[in-house]
């Protein structure tokens, strides 16, 4: 069974929607991640219909100074998702490069699909940290769990960690995250990584959205 290393930094490259709808770009990104020195590459596993509703009401329109202001959620996710039929090829390409490949599932059907691919660990996205049924289901697979905390209050983190522990899953990592794209360096607040280690029985890391490399380099010292 896969275990995250405890004696060194483990670098994860994010594929997410960076393929721009092209499988060729996705596969080239895997190779680029290897050349850049990453240990792993992460996907996101959802469809527009499993993550949101096709609705033009205000609550489904993106606002607030983001890169996607004015877009409706369903339209954006339909454009950004990684087709599930690509996953097997991406997992194989990563394996061929010596990279660990895993994903963020956004609903139980995604967990089931990823189990069929032998996904070695799961990462819960910041905006899913309050989805306790999803966390419990992923944790029940007895694989390492990485939880991002970008929008979480302490009580949300406590509940998510407890959800994993209830499933007997103690292989947990909490990531400090600022849910902005890009995230201002002055909002990095890396001291929370130390606080996480004090408050929870977990390993810690950083989900970095800042420009440049200053913040992740500093994070490796904590």
Q: Where are each of the predicted segments found?
A:
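Catalytic cores and adjacent flexible loops of soluble metabolic enzymes
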Residues: 1-222
